[in-house]
Every structure is written in structure tokens, then in C-alpha cells.
């Protein structure tokens, strides 16, 4: 499914959109990996540093969604991106409040956010599929995994020994998928430039 008819009709617009997404995805991916490294050292105690990092992660997603939203033309993809930005902002607030209640509450909020934002990411990935922006496999896989991992977090929160350690793998994995998508889009941009030169 490809709803990017406006960009395919105007190659320069499509190239600009690809370049914008390359920068956004690369930045988002690097920030996620850096966050994972930082949280790996702070996750043992749910103290002020850990809660701050937990709030920052969905805020990174919220800012990324806002940047993406502002770069998109009107349409349903833009609405989904705005929804994800608002959702991530609410998740940051929710995680901050849940931090006072303990690991279980944090996992529930993080899990609910991961499920809904993962579904939104899959939807945006499906809408971006096409000749201009590629198949979007890294984004589709990352969104699907986010959805499944979110369910796992909620199940884990109900268990005997809930832990925040899985968030490190989640963030690092998500970051790698964003970096992979940026690399694929950069390759596609180079390929298109070579064909039109």
C-alpha cells in the first residue's frame, strides 16, 4: 500500500522526504542506543536517575513524532504520527507518576505505551511502503516487536519478580531497527540519484 502519491509525482519532493527521514531515523536510533547504555547502569534501583531516564525515553519518541509530523503533508499518515506524539507525551507523564508506585506500575505503563505505539508504527510503516520510501521492513518489524514486547511487560508486571532490565534490550533493539531503516533509505536515495544522473 502506498499513499505517497504526491511524492512519487515529484521526485525532488520524494528525495527531500527520504533525506529528512534518514536524518530523523538515524538520530532516533542513536538516541535509543545511548539511552539503553545509560539505563543499563541505572536500572537496578528505581531512584530519581532511573525515573528520569524512563521519562526521557518516551519523550524522545514524542519529539521524533513531532518532527516527523511537521515534515509530512496532510493526510492520515500525519494524523497517526500526531497521535503517536501525543501518546508518547502521555506515556512520559504516566511513567513519571508510576515511578513512585514501583516497578510493576512502570512496566504496566511502559507496556501499554509499547503496544499502542507499536501498532501506530506498523500503520505508518504500511502507509510509507512503496517505490519512493522502500518496503519499510525494519519499521514494520520494530513496530510488531514493540506490540508483542508491550504485552510481555504487562505479563511480567504481574509476576513474582518484575524487572526493568528488559527495557535495555527493547530500546537498543528499537534503535538498531531505526538505524537500519535510515541506512536503507540512504541507500535508496543514492540509488535514485544514480539513476537520474
Q: Residue spans of the language-model regions?
A:
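C-terminal ends of transmembrane helices
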Residues: 62-75, 121-130, 182-187
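Polytopic alpha-helical membrane-helix bundles and their juxtamembrane interface segments
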Residues: 14, 41, 155-163, 170, ...
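Cytoplasmic-side transmembrane-helix entry/capping segments in multi-pass membrane proteins
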Residues: 75-87, 134-141
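Structural signature of hydrophobic alpha-helical transmembrane segments
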Residues: 45-60, 102-116, 168-175
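N-terminal topogenic module of multi-pass integral membrane proteins
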Residues: 1-73, 190-197
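Membrane-proximal helix-loop-helix units in multi-pass membrane proteins
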Residues: 90-139
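Hydrophobic alpha-helical transmembrane segments in multi-pass integral membrane proteins
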Residues: 35-37, 91-101, 145-163
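C-terminal transmembrane-bundle signature of multipass membrane proteins
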Residues: 173-196
Amino acid at each position: 500500500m502506498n499513499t505517497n502519491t504526491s511524492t512519487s509525482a515529484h521526485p525532488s519532493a520524494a528525495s527531500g522526504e527520504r533525506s529528512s527521514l534518514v536524518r530523523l531515523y538515524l538520530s532516533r536510533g542513536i538516541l535509543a542506543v545511548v539511552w539503553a547504555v545509560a539505563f543499563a547502569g541505572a536500572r537496578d534501583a528505581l531512584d530519581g536517575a532511573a525515573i528520569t531516564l524512563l521519562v526521557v525515553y518516551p519523550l524522545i519518541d514524542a519529539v521524533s513524532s513531532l518532527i516527523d509530523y511537521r515534515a509530512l503533508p496532510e493526510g492520515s499518515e500525519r494524523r497517526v504520527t500526531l497521535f503517536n506524539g501525543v501518546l508518547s507525551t502521555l506515556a512520559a507523564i504516566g511513567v513519571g507518576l508510576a515511578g513512585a508506585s514501583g516497578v510493576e506500575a512502570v512496566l504496566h505503563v511502559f507496556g501499554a505505551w509499547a503496544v499502542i505505539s507499536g501498532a501506530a508504527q506498523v500503520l505508518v510503516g504500511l502507509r510509507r511502503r512503496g517505490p519512493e520510501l522502500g518496503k519499510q521492513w525494519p519499521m514494520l518489524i520494530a513496530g510488531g516487536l514493540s506490540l508483542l514486547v508491550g504485552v510481555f511487560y504487562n505479563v511480567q508486571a504481574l509476576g513474582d519478580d518484575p524487572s526493568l532490565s528488559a527495557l535495555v534490550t527493547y530500546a537498543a533493539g528499537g534503535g538498531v531497527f531505526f538505524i537500519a531503516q535510515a541506512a536503507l533509505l540512504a541507500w535508496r536515495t543514492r540509488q535514485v540519484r544514480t539513476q537520474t544522473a
